[in-house]
Amino acid sequence: LLEGAPAHRRGLVASLASAASEVGALLAVGVSAVTVASMDEASLQSWGWRIPFLVGAALAGAVWIARSRMEESPEFHRQKAAGTVPESPLRHCLGKHRAAIGRAFAISALGSITYYVGITYVPAFLTSAGALSEKASLWLSTIAAVAVIVVTPFVGALSDRIGRKPVLAALSLGNVLLPMAMFSLMASGSHERALAGAVILAALAGGVSAVGAVATAEQFPGEGRVTGLALGATGATAIFGGLTPFIAQLLVERTGAAIAPGAMIAVVGLCVLPLFISMKETAPLRPPKTRQLSG
C-alpha cells in the first residue's frame, strides 16, 4: 500500500490500513455478540461457538484470493529493472541499515505498548479493578475502538502535512503525560470517567499506529525494507506486545496501584522521545502550491 501510494499521501494511505484492522476487530466482536444473543446456552456450547470461526475462515479465504491477484509494487519493479534487489536481504540490512532498524524498533515499541496496554488490556483492567461489569467494560472498549477508527486517518493525513517527526514527538510526549491519569480515571468507578480515560488512551494508541505505519517503513530504502521492518518493527511488537497486558495486570495486583499500566506506557514514551526529537524527517516534501494569476 505504502509503496504504491502517492508520495504526499503515504501517511493517509498507510493509516487507513491501520484503521481497517480495527474494523476487523469490531466485526469480530459483532459476530460474537450476535451469535451469543441469538442462541440458547446449550446450542452455543454444543456447536454455536464454531460460527464466528467459520465467518473468519470465509473472510480469510476472500482475502487470500484478493492478495493472490495483487501486483508487485512499483518500487519492487524499479529494483528489478535496476538490478538492485539484494541477494541476501538480511545481510544487506544488518550491514547498511542498523540505525534504521533501531529507529523502527523504537517507533514500534511505542505503538505496541500503547495498543496492547492502552486498548487490549483495558477491558480486563476495568473488570478486575471492580470499576465496571464485564458487559459494560466490553461496550466501553467498543466505543474506544470506534474512536481509534475515527482518529487514525486524521493523524495519518496530519503526518503528510506537517511531517512524521513532529507527530511522533507530540504523541510520545502525550504518552508520557496522560496514561497514568487515564488509568486513575478508569479506576474511579464512574462510567463517564472510565469512558473518557479509555477513549483518550485509544486515541493516543491509534495516533501512534497511524503515523508509525508509514514512519517505520520510511526508515529504509526500498532495498531491504521488508527485512528491516521484520527485524525492527516486528521485533519490538514481540517484546512490547503480547506479554505486556499480563505484566500490567501483575503490576496492578502486586502494587495495588491502578496507575501502574499507565506508568509502563509513560516509561516507553519517555525513552523514545529523545530519538523522535532528534531523528531526521522522512516524509517527502509536499509539492508547492501554485497560484493562478488573474487578469
Describe the function of each predicted region.
Residues 11-36, 231-244:
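Glycine-rich segments within core transmembrane alpha-helices of 12-TM secondary carriers
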Residues 222-254:
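A late C-terminal transmembrane helix in Major Facilitator Superfamily
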Residues 21-67:
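Helix-loop-helix hairpin linking two adjacent transmembrane segments in secondary transporters
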Residues 63-68, 266-295:
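Multi-pass alpha-helical transporter architecture, strongest
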Residues 161-172:
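Cytoplasmic membrane-interface "Motif A"-like loop-to-helix N-cap segments
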Residues 173-189:
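C-terminal ends and interior cores of transmembrane alpha-helices
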Residues 97-148, 241-245:
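Extracytoplasmic gate region of multi-pass secondary transporters
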